[in-house]
């Protein structure tokens, strides 16, 4: 592998820890939007491919790092959203010996992505093809389902530990590097773009669940990582424990405002936009557009709305079911 930084007209690679290389995939042509991470070793593993639209940038970066077709041993995605896993099929084709690692609840969508792509097309419309691209299928015999606590062997005693972390999505997991101590957190901690510097929760539909998301942050904290590497974007220059607490407080604040608006019949997106507008004070229109494109208030509001509807519906159903202990055998 080459040295601390590789920069060209289309490639930006930074070594962020011994044997860990951050790749800027240049999603949508923006710098520092979506990262992939190569963990070096006898069995190199790529964490996150980014979108299909930026996969050529990723492949060029891997080539610049010295990887040939037979060298990559694994590709791991924290979840199957297209900005994280859209390039999996292309990368699997370019590296025919690489095993693809994914959460159990996402595996079938990598093998047959038609439903995932159709759902994304309904959400993003024309933006799907212009910003993200699609997702080519991965042969099912190349896919390995990761269980919580399972290790991906990188060789020389180094491994990545899978940490089940639903909340952002039911198919989300973190990956903890045994050597550097870095935790690759996907979107479970939120989004923090370096040129904006504001941590914002990522709560998209259809899977967002507040209780699970908060629990996942606690699970990350229990692992005591040396640093948090976000897909959006990079290693956050904060104490990991403090960052995770900030993520918890920020997520709870957004959820509280969303629920208040929901209860009072207000538009959730409008309420969130007004409540947290000050977070973006001082940033120019391009930086605001960059953040809103990746992690917009309307997307977060839709996730909160879906979560509130699901939670309230479940509570109403539970209340409506009568309890008849006489038929359970518990009374005699």
Model-derived features with residue positions:
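Metal-dependent catalytic neighborhoods of phosphoester/phosphodiester hydrolases
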Residues: 85-95
């Amino acid at each position: 592998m080459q040295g601390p930084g590789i920069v060209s007209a289309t490639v930006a690679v930074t070594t962020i820890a011994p044997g860990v290389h951050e790749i800027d995939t240049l999603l949508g042509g923006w710098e520092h939007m979506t990262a992939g991470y190569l963990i070096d070793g006898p069995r190199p593993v790529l964490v996150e491919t980014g979108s299909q639209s930026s996969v050529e940038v990723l492949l060029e970066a891997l080539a610049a790092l010295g990887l040939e077709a037979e060298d990559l041993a694994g590709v791991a995605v924290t979840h199957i959203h297209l900005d994280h896993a859209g390039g999996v099929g292309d990368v699997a084709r370019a590296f025919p010996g690489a095993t693809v690692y994914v959460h159990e609840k996402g595996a079938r969508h990598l093998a047959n992505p038609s439903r995932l792509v159709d759902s994304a097309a309904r959400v993003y419309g024309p933006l799907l093809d212009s910003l993200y691209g699609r997702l080519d299928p991965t042969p099912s015999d190349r896919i390995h389902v990761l269980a919580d606590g399972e290790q991906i062997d990188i060789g020389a005693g180094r491994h990545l530990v899978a940490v089940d972390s639903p909340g952002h999505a039911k198919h989300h997991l973190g990956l903890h590097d045994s050597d550097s101590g870095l935790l690759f957190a996907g979107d479970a901690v939120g989004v923090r773009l370096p040129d904006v510097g504001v941590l914002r929760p990522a709560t998209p539909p259809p899977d967002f669940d507040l209780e699970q998301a908060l629990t996942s942050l606690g699970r990350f904290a229990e692992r005591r990582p040396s640093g948090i590497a976000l897909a959006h974007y990079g290693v956050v220059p904060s104490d990991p424990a403090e960052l995770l607490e900030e993520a918890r407080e920020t997520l709870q604040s957004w959820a509280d405002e969303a629920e208040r608006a929901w209860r009072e019949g207000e538009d959730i997106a409008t309420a969130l936009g007004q409540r947290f507008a000050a977070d973006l004070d001082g940033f120019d229109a391009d930086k605001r557009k960059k953040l809103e494109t990746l992690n917009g208030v309307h997307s977060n509001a839709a996730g909160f709305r879906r979560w509130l509807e699901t939670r309230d519906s479940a509570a109403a159903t539970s209340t409506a079911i009568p309890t008849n202990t006489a038929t359970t055998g518990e009374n005699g």
